[in-house]
From Swiss-Prot:
Main localization (coarse): cytoplasm
Name of the gene encoding the protein in the UniProt record: aroK
Assembly notes: Monomer.
UniProt xrefs under CDD domains: SK
Residues given in the record as Mg(2+) binding sites: 38
Protein name listed in UniProt: Shikimate kinase
GO biological process, one term: chorismate biosynthetic process
Pfam families with a match to the protein in the record: SKI (PF01202)
Length: 210
């Protein structure tokens, strides 16, 4: 299957090629709180005509309480167990766009399922941008500490090496949400384009040796 290089085609045409090549895989956004996963994910889903799910919202539906309340009542370990159950259930609904919680991709079981059944996209942002964004939601459970900025910095140190294992990394800094969403779509199509060409080259090499 030959695919035009995404740099030379508009988003509307990329949509057709991407959806046909994506098959039943999910586009999964990973990254820290404040990276813009939910907002960007909704825009990507709208552009591609795919269903969008926010795993945190789905967790709250399943628990019938907010994540902040769940943390207070049951603790983080129980939350992570529920997060895994909900995330793996959502992956079965692919193709879709999924915004995951900040700790989801850190879970090896979740990460393996995402890597097998989806294309993972890390939305990366620096400390100041993240803090500016999360300050609008001061009830984030993991930031209920004496020094939220230092806590965020430690989370970055712990999690960024794991987020870096994602298939794609997209900077989520000062660009508009629309621009970041477009960057994601073009990068996904480029990833698929490379994937298809590598597969075709592999088949061609096998044929030569037959």
């Amino acid at each position: 299957m030959k695919t035009n290089h995404p740099k030379h085609i508009p988003i509307t045409q990329i949509k057709k090629q991407l959806l046909s090549s994506l098959d039943k895989r999910a586009l999964v956004l990973v990254g820290l709180m404040g990276a813009g996963k939910s907002v960007i994910g909704k825009r990507i889903a709208t552009m591609l005509g795919l269903p969008f799910y926010d795993s945190d919202q789905e967790i709250e539906k399943a628990a019938q309480m907010t994540i902040t309340e769940f943390f207070k009542v049951y603790g983080e370990s129980e939350f992570r167990a529920l997060e895994q159950h909900v995330t793996l259930s959502l992956m079965k609904k692919s193709p879709l766009v999924l915004a995951t919680g900040g700790g989801a991709y850190i879970n090896e079981d979740i990460r393996q399922v995402i890597n097998k059944n989806g294309i993972s996209i890390w939305l990366k942002a620096d400390l100041d941008i993240l803090m500016k964004r999360v300050s609008r939601h001061p009830t984030r459970p993991l930031l209920q500490t004496a020094n939220p900025k230092e806590t965020m910095k430690k989370l970055m140190e712990q999690r960024y090496p794991i987020y870096a294992k994602a298939n794609l990394t997209i900077n989520s800094y000062k660009e508009s949400r629309h621009t970041v969403a477009q960057n994601v779509i073009r990068s996904v199509q480029n990833y698929i384009y490379t994937e298809i060409n590598d597969r075709n080259n592999q088949h061609a090499n096998q044929d030569r040796h037959c």
